[in-house]
């Protein structure tokens, strides 16, 4: 994995209020995107790793940064949330609180 991939991921995470690394065929990704898109009104960025040439490298970079290789890989305001189960376990009020704090709703 390249230093460039890590820098690209860090830049994407830093430049979006909500960043999700996803794969189009992943049911957990779909659930996370559905939850977030129903609440987030401003700057939800989803990167579908299976639709881009450097998707595997991006996934490796995410593992290096977070210790998590699985998708979805979710960040709110630059903070690593985790996967779909982590997102869902926040509960609606805590999730909305985090999203409000970063200006995503």
Predicted regions and their residues:
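Alpha-helical recognition domains of nuclear gene-regulatory proteins
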Residues: 12, 35-38, 61, 65, ...
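Thioredoxin-like thiol-disulfide oxidoreductase module
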Residues: 49-69, 95-104
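Non-catalytic, surface beta->alpha helical segment in thiol-disulfide oxidoreductase systems
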Residues: 76-105
């Amino acid at each position: 994995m390249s230093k460039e991939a890590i820098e690209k991921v860090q830049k994407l995470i830093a430049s979006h209020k909500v960043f999700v690394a996803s794969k189009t065929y992943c049911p957990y990704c779909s659930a996370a995107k559905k939850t977030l898109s129903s609440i987030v009104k401003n700057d939800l960025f989803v990167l579908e790793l299976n639709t881009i040439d450097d998707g595997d490298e991006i996934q490796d970079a995410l593992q290096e940064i977070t210790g998590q290789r699985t998708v979805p890989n979710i960040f709110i305001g630059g903070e690593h949330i985790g996967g779909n189960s982590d997102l869902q376990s926040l509960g609606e009020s805590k999730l909305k609180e985090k999203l409000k704090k970063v200006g995503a709703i």
